[in-house]
A protein has these predicted regions:
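Alpha-helical, heptad-rich or low-complexity scaffold/stalk segments
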Residues: 2-31, 35-50, 62, 423-424, ...
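Stable alpha-helical elements in mature extracytoplasmic
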Residues: 8, 24, 40, 56, ...
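Alpha-solenoid helical repeat scaffolds
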Residues: 11, 27, 43, 59, ...
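Cyclophilin-like peptidyl-prolyl cis-trans isomerases
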Residues: 408, 412-416, 427, 431-672
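Amphipathic alpha-helical scaffolding segments comprising HEAT/armadillo-like alpha-solenoid repeats
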Residues: 1-2, 21-33, 53-65, 86-112, ...
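Solenoidal tandem-repeat scaffolds enriched in leucines and small polar residues
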Residues: 72-74, 82-139, 148-153, 160, ...
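Alpha-helix N-cap/helix-start positions at coil->helix boundaries
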Residues: 6-7, 22, 37-39, 54, ...
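Structural signature of alpha-helical solenoid repeat scaffolds
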Residues: 17, 49, 81, 122, ...
Length: 672
């Protein structure tokens, strides 16, 4: 940070922020306050936000209240939002002060009659989303009237995530009249999140008639939040029309149909509506039981009819076991449907009977290995992949022997089953469960994947007992820095001591050759042509912003790692996600890579590394359908889709990557 070269100082500041060590804050503060280069000062502010340390907040507050270049001020506001969100409960007063400062900065920008700073507004809106300052609604709502559609988009996004009603009158107008579809979609999100009853007619109109699928889906979802059953008939008619065509060839309609099913399940809970049930039966066949939205909606509307689909008890047990043995994805979806019955309100007729029947079927699924069924297939079925969802569903019934059932799963070979069992045991504190978690931890710490070990540490932490804390301390000696970090975090939260010095350094898996190869791409054009069952799209990778993440992706693609993987997660108007060898969202390449957080924003078409926590990336990646500013500074952006984004928009859950071809050239990639 003391180099004579400004680019080196800037990169050093970024590195300090990525590491996140509080000890770097004094040096970052010096750069923020005194460096002669604006880019260095801006990066210092960004890095201080990534450190999430309160130690630098006075300097950041001084910056936003002084005359500094716009980018420096914007990054300081962004940093205050990140720090406010990360402060522990005992520093709640300070967090409120930081949130108030963010809001005051936004108020100042909204009052400028000429030349407001766009970056300050956008980063300030996201900072407000994170800091959650009191009385933020009226200030944020001011930005709904700006000419810049991206500002309107982000203002609505912040109001939606904070569930603030202050802009609802204007949002009702934007819902029907704004020319930008993402503004309309986000307007629908706010009106749904705040349960704006007067918006019913406008939302129903957009759900049925908007020319953009993202708006229709957001409006359908919002109608579910309004809980107004008047929407059911119109939505069902729309769903019937859409389902008459081959949904496998009509992606936008598929996502729309699934959202309609989900919303009807919310609007018609326990209504036993025959027409809706008939439609859902057809959808179950269309999706071959592999749409959880359909299974859950069916179970909500008529638990009796849903259970009847499987026959009497003996044949039903055999049927669900057979489905699980043939197709784990279908088994997972059935489990989610049965789990919904476990959450039925007291008012549902024959609730106890239905819950007993559903629980019996879940236990049969859990016991699938003893079914006596012999299924011959040419490919590995991996029925065990459905068991985590079976366990979560079973937990909803709160059976007396749930602890015993979960403890028995701690000896399973599948690490995700053990992780799920450990996680659920965290809500069942008892001496027997503590002993079981203690016995399971040594094995989990030797796993290739650390999911089970992390879950065990979390569950032990919830018990907040001296005995549990002593067990957690054993992870301080782990070779995995993520386990050491988790142990330190849990022990500190439990008041059992500050062992931060035990985190130590990371044992990197990268060699000198790896670093040289990754750095050699900086300045080159590196593209990934992703061929899917819906067509190809091209990603411009960003080696200058995230060299190691790009190198990891390139190495995996070059060896054909992604070929045949399914897009296991598709959330309309949010993301599509792939890269999981298991296909259930829990898999990876058997190692983890460090985050390379950067200033590239999550605009539409951004390509990011999926995580389950800091530095947990591996092979799962996602593409954003629309701007997602809440992801900025939390997930590594390592590319952008530069061609074929219309293909990404057509992708639905279950679509497949055929191949990824990497194209490198010495031509410098164009700046975005």
């Amino acid at each position: 940070m003391t180099s004579n070269r400004s680019d080196v100082r800037r990169r050093a500041a970024l590195a300090a922020g990525r590491i996140g060590n509080e000890e770097s804050v004094p040096e970052l503060t010096k750069l923020l306050q005194k460096d002669i280069n604006v880019d260095v000062r801006s990066m210092a502010a960004f890095a201080m936000g990534e450190s999430e340390s309160e130690a630098g907040t006075n300097a950041l507050l001084a910056v936003i209240n002084s005359s500094v270049p716009g980018e420096v001020r914007a990054r300081a506001i962004e940093a205050l939002g990140k720090i406010a969100a990360a402060l522990p409960k005992e520093q709640e007063t300070r967090a409120r002060e930081l949130g108030a400062a963010v809001l005051e900065a936004l108020k100042f920008e909204s009052g400028l009659r000429s030349a407001p700073n766009r970056l300050t507004i956008l980063l300030g809106l996201t900072a407000a989303l994170r800091a959650k300052p009191a009385n933020a609604g009226p200030v944020i709502a001011r930005f709904l009237g700006y000419a810049d559609p991206r500002i309107r988009i982000d203002a609505a996004n912040t109001l939606a995530r904070l569930r603030l009603k202050d802009g609802n009158e204007q949002l009702r107008k934007l819902l029907t009249a704004d020319v930008d579809p993402i503004v309309r979609a986000n307007a629908a999100r706010v009106l749904g999140a705040t349960e704006e009853k007067p918006a019913f007619d406008s939302l129903l109109d957009r759900a049925l008639n908007d020319n953009d699928a993202r708006v229709r889906v957001s409006a359908i979802r919002a109608l579910g939040s309004l809980k107004d059953a008047r929407a059911a008939d119109s939505l069902l008619k729309r769903g019937v029309v859409l389902a008459q065509s081959d949904l496998r060839e009509r992606s936008a309609e598929t996502n729309e149909v699934l959202e309609i099913a989900n919303t009807l399940g919310r609007l018609l809970q326990a209504k036993e509506d025959k027409n809706t049930l008939d439609w859902l039966r057809k959808l179950r066949e269309t999706f071959d039981h592999m749409a959880p939205e359909v299974e859950i909606a069916f179970a909500r509307i008529s638990p009796e009819a849903y259970l009847a689909e499987f026959g009497n008890e003996a044949s039903a047990k055999r049927k669900v076991q057979e489905i699980l043995l043939l197709n784990w994805r279908a088994g997972s979806c059935l489990a989610q449907g049965f789990g919904e019955i476990g959450t039925l309100p007291e008012s549902v007729k024959n609730r106890t009977v239905h819950m007993g029947a559903a629980e019996t079927l879940l236990r049969a699924m859990l016991n699938y290995r003893n079914s006596g069924l012999n299924i011959n297939t040419l490919v590995a079925v991996h029925s065990e992949y459905a068991i985590p969802d079976v366990l979560r569903a079973l937990a909803a019934f709160k059976s007396k022997d749930l602890g015993e059932v979960l403890r028995s799963q701690l000896s399973e070979s599948d690490v995700i089953i053990r992780a799920t069992a450990a996680e659920l045991l965290g809500d069942l504190p008892s001496e027997a469960n503590t002993r079981a978690l203690q016995e399971a931890l040594p094995r989990a710490m030797k796993d290739e994947l650390n999911d089970a070990a992390l879950a065990i540490l979390d569950s032990l932490g919830k018990q907040k007992t001296p005995a549990a804390n002593e067990i957690i301390k054993s992870a301080l000696d782990s070779r995995d820095h993520l386990l050491r970090r988790k142990a330190v975090t849990v022990l500190k939260a439990n008041g059992a001591g500050d062992f931060s010095s035990r985190i130590g350094t990371v044992q990197t898996r990268n060699t000198v050759a790896d670093y040289k190869r990754a750095l050699a791409r900086i300045g080159m054009s590196v593209q990934a042509v992703v061929d899917t069952t819906k067509g190809p799209f091209t990603v411009e990778l960003l080696p200058g912003e995230a060299p190691l993440n790009v190198d990891n992706f390139v190495q995996l693609a070059n060896r054909g790692y992604f070929n045949g993987f399914t897009f296991h997660r598709v959330v309309p108007n949010f993301v599509v996600q792939d890269g999981d060898p298991r296909g259930d969202g829990n898999g990876g390449p058997g190692y983890q890579i460090r985050c390379e957080i950067n200033e590239v924003p999550y605009d539409r078409s951004a390509v990011g590394m999926a995580l389950s926590g800091k530095d947990t990336g591996g092979s799962q990646w996602f593409v954003t359908h629309s701007p997602q500013p809440h992801l900025d500074g939390g997930y590594t952006v390592f590319g952008h889709v530069v061609a074929g984004m219309e293909v990404v928009d057509r992708i639905v859950r279950g679509d497949v990557i055929r191949s990824i071809v990497i194209i490198q050239s010495t031509n410098r990639s164009r700046k975005r």
